[in-house]
From Swiss-Prot:
It comes from the Eukaryota. Lacks antimicrobial activity. Does not inhibit the formation of NO by neuronal nitric oxide. This is Rothein 3.4. Transmembrane segments: none annotated. The modification Leucine amide is found at L30. GO terms for cellular component: extracellular region. The keyword Chloroplast does not apply. It comes from Litoria rothii (Roth's tree frog).
């Protein structure tokens, strides 16, 4: 499970989704 996936379950954190998506992309690219 990705950090972004966990945050998507919490609507109050919507603004962080783009940031966490970027982090997930960076981590998956390592």
């Amino acid at each position: 499970a990705s950090a972004a996936g966990a945050v998507r379950e919490d609507d109050d954190e919507t603004l962080l989704n783009p940031v966490l998506n970027s982090l997930d992309n960076l981590v998956s690219g390592l």
